[in-house]
Amino acid sequence: MQHNSYRRWITLAIISFSGGVSFDLAYLRYIYQIPMAKFMGFSNTEIGLIMSTFGIAAIILYAPSGVIADKFSHRKMITSAMIITGLLGLLMATYPPLWVMLCIQIAFAITTILMLWSVSIKAASLLGDHSEQGKIMGWMEGLRGVGVMSLAVFTMWVFSRFAPDDSTSLKTVIIIYSVVYILLGILCWFFVSDNNNLRSANNEEKQSFQLSDILAVLRISTTWYCSMVIFGVFTIYAILSYSTNYLTEMYGMSLVAASYMGIVINKIFRALCGPLGGIITTYSKVKSPTRVIQILSVLGLLTLTALLVTNSNPQSVAMGIGLILLLGFTCYASRGLYWACPGEARTPSYIMGTTVGICSVIGFLPDVFVYPIIGHWQDTLPAAEAYRNMWLMGMAALGMVIVFTFLLFQKIRTADSAPAMASSK
């Protein structure tokens, strides 16, 4: 990073932890669905409604979150978002009725998506110039994973200390998350700088955001290239959530063992592979995050080909685990780098937030359709056919990533060569 390196690393860690754990109460169902039904009195259908309420609101708010990131103080927005999310969590800990929970979920979407999502990514990206984006975003993704994993393990330990029928157990977990959010919000106030100061540190022209910039962002080809790269990688991320089902149904692995593999892939790999992608861009000959994603996508495509070949006659569970882990590595390393692509493409800082918001809307669309499609295959087809279709979907997604990283890198190379040509004249 640049001047005052230690403070910037601390700032990056605080932003990353905040951005990572802030979603945990909104997605409480992922770990605590049974306790939610038992202690909060919701049916599984109602819990599904609670989740979909947040998801729909999030999709709507991704694009406006970019405008927020470009118009308002990063320090004030991140601090406010974390503290308000913590206060909402304290309300959630009272075990409110369904209509209140739905309102809380909408409020969570406002604080974590509208106020925090694009702001946190832009604030992190401004901690370095375009050549440092791979390192910054890689470590951001890894630190997010560390924060999520650490807090999840701690709250699970606290939850396990209570009797199975003690309703205080879930309440305590929610309160712990809420207090952590508020404390992180306070830390953000002292460590996160306002975007005006960061622009000055990077010697960039201070420009105010205008409504016409939204259309300008949509007219920039690299916005669409970055969006489609994220779209493809996120499709693989969604597919990996079925790894537990795949190992149990196709290889006969026990549910407990497969669940541990799910933790390794979804928690540990997220913490390790994001920084690893940044390290590759920093210390290898391939300095470009876009090129690294392309190489990882080729490796992922070969892995999916192997999974497709072994799908019809699975025999070695070790091979199945190895291939899933390899696919997980390519996915999480790419996730740690894809937000570096707009910065590498020299997106101006004054529209970086809007770019992130638009890329989020397009790139995260697989979150809407992948799960229903794969679920339909699982319900209507034999397991082997369902997972064959899933691997084919993944291959199509990575093929798209390879194409759009090629197009994006061509644009980046052209932009990099322009200053050199100008200086030689």
Swiss-Prot record:
Residues 30-48, 160-171, 241-259, 313, 376-388 are periplasmic. GO terms for molecular function: transmembrane transporter activity. InterPro entries: MFS, MFS_dom, MFS_trans_sf. CDD domains: MFS (cd06174). It comes from Escherichia coli (strain K12). This is Inner membrane protein YqcE. It is a multi-pass membrane protein. GO terms for cellular component: plasma membrane. Gene3D superfamilies: MFS general substrate transporter like domains (1.20.1250.20).
